[in-house]
Amino acid sequence: DFSSKNDELTALSPSVQRGNIIRLTTAQALAGANTTVIFATGSIVGNALAPDKSLATLPITIFVIGMAMGILPTGAIARRYGRRTSFLVGTSCGVITGLLATLAVLMSSFWLYCLATFFGGAYTAVVLSFRFAAADGVEAAKKARALSFVMGGGVVAGIVGAHLVTYTMHLWSSYMFAATYLAQAAVAALSALVLMGIKLPMPTVEEATGGGRPLSLIIRQPLFITAVICGAVSYSLMNFLMTAAPLGMKMGGHSQESSNL
């Protein structure tokens, strides 16, 4: 219950709480780069590998589907085994994403690349929970500051991801972006190492057994419906702009470095 959760937080020393925020912020900057890499390269690689050019942006669609499908399992793992376990499962998906994408480029396999982006979406579903872990891992008075630090890590992630693509895309000269995806897998593994040292309260008995309001009740609330509509519209606009932009810029004569940024 709430009191037992509060007792666990009180038992965490200030240094442990600070360490949690540092680790989550660092992991956000590293793991969040996954999304930037996929959006920067997905439509371009898709266009190169697709049997039909009209399918060029399908890998990004699969990425979004993977993210949506990963949210509930991510929450279930965190509720049953703790957030740390959920994070490590997620970063494993990140490593798989990079390795499968590299193999897809080497084999010129469009559908394998789509599978890779699906795992990338599942990875992102876990990354989205870092901010909630930050709030769970500190006392109430420090929640706002903890959230701001972790969200700031997301800004760094955009820079890290763009530069990761720029500096690695030609390293494997015969296979553009193959080295990028290997680097992406390495960054996901590094993120896992960072998260292994995190210390967060374990789920209470009520949380682990699925206590709380049923989902059927939550989804009928006006505030929930409003939030879902706003999220769907805003994410649709973002995806509409970001999915085709890199490919459109390349076809318009801009450099790959420019589209990465």
Predicted regions and their residues:
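C-terminal ends and interior cores of transmembrane alpha-helices
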Residues: S92-M107
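Pair of pore-lining "gating" transmembrane helices in MFS-fold secondary transporters
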Residues: P14-N47, F118, R220-L241
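Juxtamembrane intracellular "pre-TM" segments in multi-pass secondary transporters
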Residues: S3-R18, I198-I229
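C-terminal membrane-cytosol helix-exit motif in multi-pass small-molecule transporters
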Residues: G161, V165-Y167, A185-E206
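Cytoplasmic helix-loop-helix junction between adjacent transmembrane helices
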Residues: C114-G153
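Short amphipathic helix-loop junctions that connect adjacent transmembrane helices
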Residues: A40-K53, T243-S258
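Helix-loop junctions at membrane interfaces in 12-TM secondary transporters
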Residues: R18, L103-L115
